[in-house]
Swiss-Prot record:
Pathway: Carbohydrate metabolism; tricarboxylic acid cycle; succinate from succinyl-CoA (ligase route): step 1/1. Signal peptide: none annotated. It comes from Mycolicibacterium smegmatis (strain ATCC 700084 / mc(2)155). The gene is sucC. Binds 1 Mg(2+) ion per subunit. This is Succinate--CoA ligase [ADP-forming] subunit beta.
Amino acid sequence: MDLFEYQAKELFAKHNVPTSPGRVTDSAEDAKTIAEEIGRPVMVKAQVKTGGRGKAGGVKYAATPDDAFTHANNILGLDIKGHVVKKLLVAEASDIAEEYYISFLLDRANRTYLAMCSVEGGMEIEEVAATKPERLAKVPVDAVKGVDLAFARSIAEQGHLPAEVLDAAAVTIQKLWEVFVKEDATLVEVNPLVRTPDDQILALDGKVTLDENAGFRQPGHAEFEDRDATDPLELKAKENDLNYVKLDGQVGIIGNGAGLVMSTLDVVAYAGENHGGVKPANFLDIGGGASAAVMAAGLDVILGDSQVKSVFVNVFGGITACDAVANGIVQALQILGDEANKPLVVRLDGNNVEEGRRILAEANHPLVIQAETMDAGADKAAELANK
């Protein structure tokens, strides 16, 4: 989960990373009030989860509260790379002597953590990597040893930060590592990390990505969820503990196990080539549970997608036997009632398959069509979606 800058700075404050004081708002009038409270020039910054805010006119210097009002009025509603600005961060403008770059991230290729540090802050780090690679330090971090002050100082030194700021920078770098580890982040980035004329080190910007898989031990992170930006179907699936990703096709997919669901997407896409080019509408993995409640929740999410014209339920019975899945489907259709209004192609195989098929046959629901194989089921679902 990507955070807005103001949310990243909330985590920074929690771990004593120094930042410039400010507040978030969604109104120009409030932006003026915040500027008056700060009593110094401020920066008015669009809160969007994308880069290039400055170039798009989303970051402005305001010398007076009236300037803050004017800039806020202009920035709110601005479209920045498809992201509409709904919130602003009004923060005290800082005097800047130098700008640096620091980040911690997962290095998936080398299966380790990585610190990146550069004296060339305030610009796109990709540009630094391309034009001045020698100015960008990439330092592997041992997950067990972590980052103490000495190692943090070494990271700053390798990033070519001036000798006179190494000690102060090391303190902030260690605290950013604390944010990375204790908040279960996959990215913590500060660009720029600045030195002020009086040699303070401040995180003027902040970019944090949290690992949603760690949500069970980070309940407080739920408050960072941007419900306005989250697809409502994905939000509903998440509330029901379903692994769901919306796609742009017409055939709804329900399966048990990520591997089987991925294979089902491929088979449906292939079958769709013979039926008007229809495609899978989603990824939905119900995992090991196929109870009536789980199946009803899954169908409710999929049928809420207006693009879906048919649904393909593809289940291989293992620990969860096919008869339990079949009972779940029958009961789910009873729970949903008239809301279940799209044809349902069901392919069962594996443990207790004959009993599962018998249960579906006896139920004789008008929407349910059984298929013997995955290929046959995919073909039928694609055919129905193309009608």
